[in-house]
Amino acid sequence: MRFDIKKVLELAEKDFETAWRETRALIKDKHIDNKYPRLKPVYGKPHPVMETIERLRQAYLRMGFEEMINPVIVDEMEIYKQFGPEAMAVLDRCFYLAGLPRPDVGLGNEKVEIIKNLGIDIDEEKKERLREVLHLYKKGAIDGDDLVFEIAKALNVSNEMGLKVLETAFPEFKDLKPESTTLTLRSHMTSGWFITLSSLIKKRKLPLKLFSIDRCFRREQREDRSHLMSYHSASCVVVGEDVSVDDGKVVAEGLLAQFGFTKFKFKPDEKKSKYYTPETQTEVYAYHPKLGEWIEVATFGVYSPIALAKYNIDVPVMNLGLGVERLAMIIYGYEDVRAMVYPQFYEYRLSDRDIAGMIRVDKVPILDEFYNFANELIDICIANKDKESPCSVEVKREFNFNGERRVIKVEIFENEPNKKLLGPSVLNEVYVYDGNIYGIPPTFEGVKEQYIPILKKAKEEGVSTNIRYIDGIIYKLVAKIEEALVSNVDEFKFRVPIVRSLSDINLKIDELALKQIMGENKVIDVRGPVFLNAKVEIK
């Protein structure tokens, strides 16, 4: 809210210390349900794979590499050139592209009758136009997604009727089967690099340092926790007369050091792909101090002069590649690549912060005057909670409700002797820790020994909802006062003895959070003695 600057400065001029304390009242607290952690920052969330791709892009650029986009669709002929006798085994893991054939469809009398039976008046001119459409489609001059429109146009009917003509008069279109081509989807980035370099080698000055991060496709027998049929490769090439495997080691270290890896081992790869020069194909193992283990993260090698010669490339080329998803799993701590790449198909796990933000006060006073009264009543209860019983605290306030003057008297009492006005759990605060919900007291005095370790850990490492038992209970009490005013109830009693569940302290939890807690066998333990007794009179 805005405040009176002139008045504030005048107060400060008279007595700065007093003004400093009193102006605290000008900074209003937020509504209980708009406080942290229910109040959350709103921002977009990148996908871990896309985030890793961007980090890799920047890492390559910092190392002086130029970004390229390599061909995704590769003719099988290129695989034969690159792999030689190994090509058939490689092509077995490639996806071939297929397309529907374009049938040679005629327009005989039988089809004309079918069209007429649809209520279409078809004369010789329309027949000729329709024949021309079918002929142009066969030749490829008309695209498949334009065929219905062109049929409708030829017959001078609506698009809907054109579709009906295609379905009923030309059923042969339904029986078409895809026919494979010699085109494949890139199964690894190398197949694209040979094509790119064969074009660049005579145009650009050496050495060349190029990188490309893009999708590849591999026809796996099945997808599992570490293999997908579609993945991203972060690949680079270094092209120059003096290029060797040492360049691969340098690039691997320079690239991966930017992701927290500190030590590196290079081991000969037993696979020995034929597009690499013998004894150059190398696996990169890197040590990540956070994970405390050595991890295989990349492969590099020098392309075979035989494969290079088939593309008129006459200088050595070092190629390094790593799977983006593999690196992302390491960075973000995933154990299953499917759950990381496609989280929408897997169980989403709420963090403690998420769950804490999903715990809210159930019944809250609607009118500002009563909401403020509830806050005042909370402070009074806290100030008097340790009064020896029998005892009571009476609070009387006057309100204007629906144009009428109403006096509200609230009495908080404890009649049983040798007790206190309120029970020891009134200041317990609700925390979320490791997916569990706990009610934790300000101190652990009087708490059973076996509960202290977990409660201490939850308080230190968990997320507080910033809601105490007394908050929820008093908000409910004052909300009932509002209800009583509406219903013309003159008095009522209110009692909360022992808390056993969230509802006992006027809290509710989102169904998503509750589902996770129940599904993971977590606990909601907010038990505690409150012993709050109140009597309300309205005049």
From Swiss-Prot:
This is O-phosphoserine--tRNA(Cys) ligase. Belongs to the class-II aminoacyl-tRNA synthetase family. O-phosphoseryl-tRNA(Cys) synthetase subfamily. InterPro entries: aa-tRNA-synth_II, aa-tRNA-synth_II/BPL/LPL, O-Pseryl-tRNA(Cys)_ligase, Phenylalanyl-tRNA_Synthase, SepRS_C. Homotetramer. Interacts with SepCysS. It comes from the Archaea. Keywords: Aminoacyl-tRNA synthetase, ATP-binding, Ligase, Nucleotide-binding, Protein biosynthesis. Its EC number is 6.1.1.27. Substrate binds at H188, M189, T190, S233, A234, S235, Y275, Y276, N319. GO terms for molecular function: ATP binding; phenylalanine-tRNA ligase activity; phosphoserine-tRNA(Cys) ligase activity; tRNA binding. Catalyzes the attachment of O-phosphoserine (Sep) to tRNA(Cys). The keyword ATP-binding applies. SUPFAM superfamilies: Class II aaRS and biotin synthetases. One of its GO terms (cellular component) is cytoplasm. GO terms for biological process: phenylalanyl-tRNA aminoacylation. It catalyses: tRNA(Cys) + O-phospho-L-serine + ATP = O-phospho-L-seryl-tRNA(Cys) + AMP + diphosphate. It comes from Methanocaldococcus jannaschii (strain ATCC 43067 / DSM 2661 / JAL-1 / JCM 10045 / NBRC 100440).
